[in-house]
Structure formats: C-alpha cells, structure tokens
Amino acid sequence: MANTLVQDDSVEWMDLGDGIQRKVMAYDAGMMIVKVAFEKGSIGTLHKHPHTQASYVSKGIFDITIDGKTERLNAGDVYFVPSDKIHGAVCIEKGELVDVFAPMREDFV
C-alpha cells in the first residue's frame, strides 16, 4: 500500500472494539501512518512493540503514559515512543491520534 497520495474517505475504519477504530492510511516496509479514533473514556491499554512510534494528537484530549510517566496532551501535541517502551493512552475527550511507525507494523495489515 505504498500509495503516494491517499484520500481519507478512500480508507475504511476497522472497529477494534471498546470505542476504538483504526485506519491504516499508507505504508511501505520502512514506515506506516495510521489514524486511531477514540470515544471518550476509551483506553489504549499499556503495551510495547519493537517499532519506533511518533504520534500527533489531531483531535481531543488524552492522558498518555510512556515508560511509567503520564501527561495530558491536547490537540496539536505530539509524543514519541522509543522501541520497546511500555506506553498507552486514555481518551479524556473524544479524539483522534495519527501514529507513525518505523518500520511498518506487519500486525496491522
């Protein structure tokens, strides 16, 4: 799916349950960009993966935990997760994250 131009409405949301949906927007072997929509109160449980992750809060308010430290982030804020660091998110106000992974998440396709 290494399309160079992707229109938002051309990609379907995948329902992950518990008020969370995901759209894999584009990827190649080296990188992937994903939108994740959260309902208020939804929890992205603590987890880790070998991929480096950078995330942009495009909408809403989230409590983001990385390596045991939690901070509240608002629309326009960014966070970075190094490889294999435990992290997660709690949606305080309905919102959306734009996640970039390097390399791509093979488990998402």
List PLM regions with ranges.
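A short, N-terminal "cap"/entry segment at the start of jelly-roll beta-barrel domains
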Residues: 1-30
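Conserved short histidine dyad/triad with adjacent acidic residue
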Residues: 34-48
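Histidine-centered metal-chelating micro-motifs
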Residues: 43-44, 63, 79, 83-88
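Glycine- and acidic-residue-biased ligand/ion/polar-headgroup-sensing regions
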Residues: 51-62, 67
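A cytosolic small-molecule/anion-sensing beta-strand core signal
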Residues: 58-59, 74, 93
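Structural motif
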Residues: 61-63, 70, 86, 96
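Short acidic-glycine-tyrosine-enriched beta hairpin
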Residues: 69-83
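Ligand-binding loop in jelly-roll beta-barrel domains
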Residues: 83-107
